[in-house]
From Swiss-Prot:
SUPFAM superfamilies assigned to the protein according to its UniProt record, in alphabetical order: Immunoglobulin, MHC antigen-recognition domain
Protein name: MHC class I-like protein MILL2
Region (Alpha-1), start-end ranges: 28-119
Recorded superkingdom: Eukaryota
An annotated GO BP: response to retinoic acid
Domain Ig-like C1-type: 192-302
Keywords recorded for this protein, A-Z: Cell membrane, Disulfide bond, Glycoprotein, GPI-anchor, Lipoprotein, Membrane, Signal
Residue ranges of the region described as Disordered: 308-349
Homology family: Belongs to the MHC class I family.
Cellular-component GO terms for this entry: external side of plasma membrane; extracellular space
InterPro entries (UniProt xref): Ig-like_dom, Ig-like_dom_sf, Ig-like_fold, Ig_C1-set, MHC_class-I_related, MHC_I-like_Ag-recog, MHC_I-like_Ag-recog_sf, MHC_I/II-like_Ag-recog
Gene that specifies this protein: Mill2
Length: 372
């Protein structure tokens, strides 16, 4: 998308609507990378100006934020700032005015057709490409109106398809949609090339997170059950396996957790997994973390600390407050807060929580999953 002229007014209203028909991270295979643009344009009644906001994601994590009023993009992830982020932002800012102009024209046609009966109106565009492990690519381009999908580009037929509720408006919107050859070029070539460039940039800004930290806590219940919870912090990528072992063998029964690796917001990742056991069985269980070519084993109950969290993790805890309180079971990274999860552990209600950090740490070359 090349730069073009167009003027956006003062930032009076920026609306961020639900993402349009994007795939969840869990449906993507390991080694797949994605680049997605979520574009929202708002037209205010009685005004000829458009307010535009673009959120740019790499591997489903907010990467850059573009403000159409200022025609500028800013790095969103704090660990990107100061590491080539300005150059990346400038390049992205040069690419977006064309899409802004296209949405403005579509919106003007829509307003004229509806006769200015209400406002504000919003149009959305989602541009998404995937880079597979084997080097193949695929892409998605959706246009939406008022938070509902309006047009979807079919890469097989190279045509735009429209949802049933908007069939009567097809003559208004479809002529303003991007031409098929431009969409195909963007999804097949431009977007994957940008994604590869972003991944290359990110490979140079991986923060020194220190060692992974594994913490095991437990909680007693009056009914005679105990919940053991294993938490892993300071993960340098989403590629990690955390599981419970009983006498050295993996356990699946009575195990629960988020089932995914979650971002901590500082360039690191975290996750947790819990298991319900009977009193006295604790010594039979151990938590196993596999991450960055290392395996960390932590027993369920050791009665004493097995190591120290890394410096960066400890510093973050000191700045953000206690990781765990009686009423706020987990506040770091927002995994579980307050009493939302009745099975969330309270370290004070069972044996002393134990922690282990692995040394030496093996740091990956990028902060995102890389194909083997």
């Amino acid at each position: 998308m090349e730069a073009s002229s167009g003027t956006a007014g003062p930032a009076v209203l920026l609306l961020i609507l639900a993402l349009l028909l994007t795939e969840s991270q869990g449906s993507r295979s390991q080694g797949t990378h994605t680049l997605r643009y979520d574009v929202t344009a708002c037209f205010l009644e009685g005004s000829e100006q458009t307010r535009l906001l673009v959120l740019i994601y790499v591997d489903d994590e907010l990467f850059l934020r573009y403000n159409g009023d200022r025609r500028s993009a800013k790095p969103w992830a704090c660990w990107i700032k100061g590491h080539g982020g300005d150059e990346t932002c400038t390049r992205e800012a040069e690419n977006l005015p064309k899409e802004e102009e296209r949405l403005r024209e579509m919106m003007a046609d829509m307003i004229n057709q509806k006769g200015h009966d209400k406002g504000p109106y919003t149009l959305q565009a989602t541009l998404d490409c995937e880079l597979q492990r084997n080097g193949s690519t695929r892409g998605f381009w959706h246009l939406g109106y008022e938070g509902r999908n309006l047009l979807t580009f079919d890469q097989k037929t190279l045509t735009w398809t429209m949802d049933v509720p908007f069939t009567q408006q097809k003559k208004t919107f479809e002529p303003r949609a991007p031409k098929a050859d431009l969409v195909k070029t963007f999804l097949d070539e431009t977007c994957p090339a940008r994604l590869q460039r972003h991944l290359a940039s990110l490979s140079n800004v991986l923060p020194d997170t220190g060692s992974p930290v594994v913490i095991v806590t437990c909680r007693n219940y009056p009914v005679g059950r105990i919940t053991l919870t294993c938490r892993a912090f300071n993960l340098s990528s989403r590629v990690a396996t955390l599981l419970w072992l009983r006498d050295g063998k993996p356990v699946q029964q009575d195990v629960f957790g988020p089932g995914t690796i979650l971002p901590s917001g500082d360039g690191t990742y975290q996750t947790w997994v819990s298991i319900r056991v009977l009193p006295g069985q604790e010594p039979q269980f151990a938590c196993n973390l596999r991450h960055s070519n290392r395996t960390i084993m932590q027993t369920a109950v050791s009665g004493e600390s097995m190591g120290w969290p890394s410096a960066s993790w400890a510093t973050r805890q000191e700045a953000e407050g206690p990781h765990r309180t009686h009423n706020d079971h987990v506040v770091d990274g927002g995994l579980v807060t307050g009493n939302a999860n009745k099975d969330s552990p309270d370290a004070s209600s069972c044996a002393t929580a134990s922690a282990i950090s692995a040394f030496p740490v093996v740091v990956l070359s990028v902060a995102l999953p890389r194909a083997n």
